[in-house]
């Protein structure tokens, strides 16, 4: 019995000891939790005294600050230095001691007081800290002043956009959130942003986004703003879906200029192209020749639209006419180099322009005595190919042949300029020497007065055939 009573007593003592320890521990926990969260001294009692080691171990980190910066410029900008006096968070906050400003009479001392509305007096510092409206008003600080950073963050407004309903968000280099923050499957827009970040060449960038305003008609296909907008220049698709309106795809009609898909098979009545119109658009020289031979007349409305063809036909205004030599159509004015010298200096404005001849005019009356004589292979005033040539006018150079003579240099080339048949060399009309578009007077001694010594060589070259261009007089 004694042994049983002793064991019961020991168990009872152990139970009481356990209960006492539990009560003491709970009271200690309550006392610790009742202590203030921010004690006066935050410095721990550790053997380390080097500030670099303490900062590296994280003992200098302030729980209130989000960015653990140690650079003095960054700390000064964020207001973490002891000497920094940050502006008031509240606009109308008043200083507790308003009377201390009465003790100061120096303007600099008054400006340094906390009761002063703005501690900074430099306009650049005021603009950087957000005092753009006035000293008594506080705006949120904007650390970025570079125009590229402002444009990237969406802080630049467009002139053609409504500023009431613009949604901006910074365009990050990687628009996809970290894996630790993704708690749901990605939607279509977020998948597009991921594809855009991986392959920016295939998907349009943020600068090519069309931002839609609420005041704009939702399905306005014919609105000029849809196509004149600076964001809609190259594409109507995507940007990061962070507070931005995703533009809807507008199915363009057949009149849309930027419609890159093929046109439908059904065409409207005014767009139907007849086969006759296609045949009428042919601009072949051979077809024109056949028409001229069949009709016996020349069409005045030329079908040619190429600038080279128009220049060869002489239909383009120019200071110096140089066409006709390389014409393949036979309609150009047939001017020789010797005639070209006098064309611009002739009083007749129609100099060098010749008339077409019809078939009855070309055919000479047939003598009944010559009926047995075969006709000549090439009729007069005609081309070997069958094209009718021009009728020479009275102001052309006189010659015996109906066709223009080739520019063969005479024995004395200078006599061609002295014996000008169009000029009456009197005292009232002095002699002139013509070279292209220049009109140079003769010297009083009777010799030519040359502006450049190389003119003689040029004139001598013009008198010989041009062997480098064998087809120059091919069709003339």
From Swiss-Prot:
Outline the segment boundaries, as ranges, of region: Disordered. 275-298, 360-385
Q: Does the keyword Secreted apply?
A: yes
Q: Which cysteines are joined by disulfide bonds?
A: none
Question: Where does it reside?
Answer: Secreted
Tree of life domain? Eukaryota
* Signal sequence coordinates: 1-34
Tell me the keywords, alphabetical order. Answer: Amidation, Cleavage on pair of basic residues, Neuropeptide, Secreted, Signal
Q: What is its main location?
A: secreted
A single BP term in Gene Ontology: neuropeptide signaling pathway
Q: For bias kind Acidic residues, which ranges apply?
A: 286-297
Q: Which residues form a coiled coil?
A: none
Residues carrying Valine amide: 133
Expression (tissue specificity): Neuropeptide-like precursor 1-1: Expressed in antennal lobe (AL), corpora cardiaca (CC), corpora allata (CA) and gnathal ganglion (GNG) (at protein level). Expression in AL detected in all animals, in GNG in most animals, expression in CC and CA in few animals (at protein level). Neuropeptide-like precursor 1-2: Expressed in antennal lobe (AL), corpora cardiaca (CC), corpora allata (CA) and gnathal ganglion (GNG) (at protein level). Expression in AL detected in all animals, in GNG in some animals, expression in CC and CA in few animals (at protein level).
Proregion positions = 160-232, 259-476
Q: Name one GO cellular component term.
A: extracellular region
Name this polypeptide is given:
Neuropeptide-like precursor 1
- The source organism is Agrotis ipsilon (Black cutworm moth)
Taxonomic lineage? Eukaryota, Metazoa, Ecdysozoa, Arthropoda, Hexapoda
